[in-house]
UniProtKB/Swiss-Prot annotation:
Organism (species): Endomicrobium trichonymphae
Pfam families given in the database record: AAA (PF00004), AAA_lid_3 (PF17862), FtsH_ext (PF06480), Peptidase_M41 (PF01434)
Protein name: ATP-dependent zinc metalloprotease FtsH
EC identifiers of the protein: 3.4.24.-
UniProt KW 4Fe-4S keyword: no
Free-text cofactor note: Binds 1 zinc ion per subunit.
Chain segments annotated as transmembrane: 6-26, 103-123
Subunit structure as annotated in this protein's UniProt entry: Homohexamer.
Length: 631
């Protein structure tokens, strides 16, 4: 319900008071001339009275004085039975009589404004009182209570992360039957910290624990504790734990706890920082409540490195559960959970989709299924097919297609050679991931892309794999140089990635023969976390020169490998470009056939490439076959 504006109410009350006062003033007569009754009779006989109102106890009217000025008058009536006859004889234009007014009307007109002013003052004081109550409510927690929800989340709704479920199963058993643990003298963890990459399902897992245990679930965000008023955060922490004790057994969940639990400052800002006060109160509360009370705190973050050590010590967050990105088996299970909500065609293979989505977390997979459903609905399909799933993967990885972007034939050739260079180098390097798809259709910010997908989940990367990745990144630039004797800005992102990989190989991974296994680069930590007030150099200037030299050697040697592969396979490069300009998309199987010297099957009539594109690609194919590659 919309609250009324107090100034709006104030305006109307003031206006009403003014109107009543004006009416009362008009009723009292304002600047009226008081006449004796005899004078009143004389004016009637003189014919100067033209309006008379006879009321009980008072006569009012208007007359014209000797100067011809109209004036209002009043007089006290006498017992005069000839008054009406005299007014008729002297042609008084207007005269009337009124009945005796009631005491209620007189009281309203006389005391109404005063009563309204009193009521207005009372209303203002009441508003101030409510304002004080609202100010006091700042200290109340904003945690949302979920109990007996119609859509209860359980472990069946959380696919994958089996190890995390096992770690949390003890909490569920304790919340269901705390006496079994207390009888043996065991103590259940007071707090559990869930940490992992964004989108891995930390919040969903916490809700599933509450759903499995069937206990109240208070959920809050770390940012909700800190407000503009000092002391509000600490008050909300106290109120949250008070609610938990009253509803025990229950779960308290704080999402993104790094917003309030960051490492305390090293004297900067003093001890009165609001976030620090809130953290101190949280530490006190976690010490103050006993695990026997049946209140368990679960927190989630994707930045455990910035949390205060006092928050992570035993007795507070006793158990820390890492939620890893799902592997192949987990991804297939997650896809199965989300695909239950949509209608799938028979050609959809969730195992194939899971293999094509390495690195995808739960949120990415949920988005993939939803994107595929939207694409199917856009095409008025009855079910989601495999083509929709593959297009959804491309949209997530590279962005939506930008078919409306018009490019000249020259730029299209450059992009085709650039992507063909990446593809060719990737196919001839032993440690490179297989090429899944290459396209010259603009997607998102990219004008074209080469998609490589690993055959299995990897947790380690070898030096040879990194060197091959560098050569693949330079494949596009090398192809441009050899074919057009010109370089463009299209390789900007490739060069940036390659430089970053080479720098980490030298300074972090210890993969330089000259420098050796030394960590020369400080990890990515934020300044002012109470750990480092200033950055100090971890190596000398001479070592910095050596680092630059080693990075340069790695980059140039990788580029030379890419150049040799492309020069030795110019004919294959031209064929890949020819088919790319004709079809715009090539699969990994198509690339394998081209390298083997096989011809690709002609485009079907239902292909999305129109006749004009086919004619243009034929002309471009002739130009490509006649092009001379400069060694």
């Amino acid at each position: 319900m919309k609250k009324s504006n107090p100034w709006f109410v104030f305006f109307w009350i003031t206006l009403l008071v003014i109107v009543l006062m004006f009416i009362n003033f008009a009723r009292q007569g304002g600047n009226e001339v008081e006449l004796e009754y005899s004078q009143f009779k004389q004016h009637i006989k003189a014919g100067s009275v033209f309006k008379v109102l006879v009321a009980p106890g008072l006569i009012r009217g208007q007359f014209r004085d000797g100067d011809g000025v109209f004036k209002r008058f009043k007089t006290v009536p006498m017992d005069d039975p000839n008054l009406v006859k005299d007014m008729e004889d002297n042609k008084v234009l207007e005269f009337s009589a009124t009945e005796k007014s009631g005491w209620l009307g007189s009281l309203l007109l006389n005391w109404g404004p005063v009563v309204l002013l009193i009521l207005f003052c009372f209303w203002m004081m009441r508003g101030m009182s409510m304002g004080n109550k609202q100010a006091m409510s700042f200290g109340k927690t904003k945690a949302k209570l979920a109990v007996g929800a119609s859509k209860k989340i359980t472990f069946k709704d959380v696919a994958g992360c089996d190890e995390a479920k096992e770690e949390l199963q003890e909490l569920i058993e304790f919340l269901k039957d705390p006496a079994r643990f207390q009888k043996l003298g065991g103590k259940i963890p007071k707090g559990v910290l869930l940490f992992g990459s964004p989108g891995t399902g930390k919040t969903l897992l916490a809700k599933a624990v509450a759903g499995e245990a069937n206990v109240p679930f208070f959920s809050s965000s770390g940012s909700e504790f800190v407000e503009m008023f000092v002391g509000v955060g600490a008050s909300r922490v106290r109120d949250l734990f008070d609610h938990g004790r009253k509803s025990a057994p229950c779960l308290l969940f704080i999402d993104e706890i790094d917003a309030v639990g960051r490492h305390r400052f090293a004297g900067i800002g003093g001890g009165h920082d609001e976030r620090e006060q809130t953290l101190n109160q949280l530490l006190v509360e976690m010490d103050g409540f006993d695990s026997k009370e049946g209140v368990i705190l679960i927190a989630a973050t994707n930045r455990p490195d910035v949390l205060d050590p006092a928050l992570l010590r035993p007795g507070r967050f006793d158990r820390q559960v890492i939620i890893l990105s799902p592997d192949l088996k987990d991804r297939e299970e997650i896809l199965g959970v989300h695909s239950k909500k949509i209608r799938l065609d028979n050609d959809v293979n969730l195992n194939v989709i899971a293999r094509r989505t390495p690195g995808f977390v739960g949120a990415d997979l949920a988005n993939l299924v939803n994107e595929a459903a939207l694409l199917a609905a856009r095409n008025s399909q009855n079910a989601v097919n495999m083509k929709n799933m593959e297009e959804a993967i491309d949209r997530i990885l590279a962005g939506p297609q930008r078919k409306s972007r018009l490019m000249s034939d020259k730029e299209k050739n450059i992009i085709a050679y650039h992507e063909a260079g990446h593809t060719l180098v990737a196919k001839f390097l032993p440690s490179a991931d297989p090429v899944h798809k290459v396209s010259i259709i603009p997607r998102g910010p990219a004008l074209g892309y080469t998609l490589q997908l690993p055959e299995e989940d990897k947790y380690l990367t070898s030096k040879s794999e990194l060197l091959d990745k560098l050569s693949i990144l330079f494949g596009g630039r090398v192809a441009e140089e050899l074919v057009f004797s010109e370089i463009t800005t299209g390789a900007q992102n490739d060069i940036s990635k390659a430089t970053g990989i080479a720098m980490r190989m030298v300074t972090e991974f210890g993969m330089s023969d000259k420098i050796g296994p030394m960590a020369l680069q400080r990890p990515n930590e934020e300044v002012f976390l109470g750990r480092d007030i200033s950055r100090d150099a971890r190596h000398s200037g001479k070592t910095s020169e050596l680092i630059d030299e080693e990075v340069k050697n790695i980059i140039y040697s990788s580029k030379s490998r890419a150049s040799k592969i492309i020069k030795d396979n110019v004919s294959i490069l031209n064929k890949i470009v020819s088919y790319l300009l004709e079809r715009e998309n090539l699969s990994g199987e198509d690339i394998d056939k081209i390298i083997k010297g096989e011809e690709l099957a002609p485009l079907s009539e239902s292909s999305s490439v129109d006749e004009e594109t086919k004619k243009k690609s034929t002309v471009e194919k002739k130009v490509i076959n006649e092009k001379v590659i400069i060694s």
